[in-house]
């Protein structure tokens, strides 16, 4: 994808603020293997981080700022990891020996966890595909995390703690989704929807 776009693979070769490569989601629970390739990695849950990040980007871009000054400012957002601001040294066996941060860069970097899903940012307008897709319905998240705690499950571990939306919020957002998209079906999304404590009133 980067090659087709004419965007250099390595972060150090991208000098413009227009060519940022940003990563997020479950793969960033171990961000170091792709640290040379991304400019920014969101650690944790990105809905609220992304809003702050985009607002900051717009401000810096409007002022004609350079990439490095923007990245230093972005690193101050909780859960935003900017690999170029850190130096990692390794033991002979390949394990991490030390992580050193540039002046002003936070260490350790704490992942961002949304405390209240009822008040968290939730987009009202979704892109609807113009062709038939496998999951041809709206998707509404009912809770995050999982009460099971299975040791083999990465998602069950990294999305802790368990947080539920109230059934009233789920119902309201589901109605908005149907109105905005034209879908008549909704998927109630979570790691284990049958464990949602408010399933009956919903």
Model-based region annotation:
Residues 10, 57-60, 81, 86, ...:
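Sequence-level detector for tyrosine residue identity
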Residues 115, 119-202:
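Radical SAM [4Fe-4S] cluster-binding motif and immediate context
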Residues 82-137:
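Ferredoxin-type iron-sulfur electron-transfer modules and their immediate structural context
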Residues 49-55, 68, 76, 110, ...:
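Residue-identity detector for glutamine
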Residues 29, 45, 65, 112-115, ...:
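Short coil/turn linker and secondary-structure boundary residues
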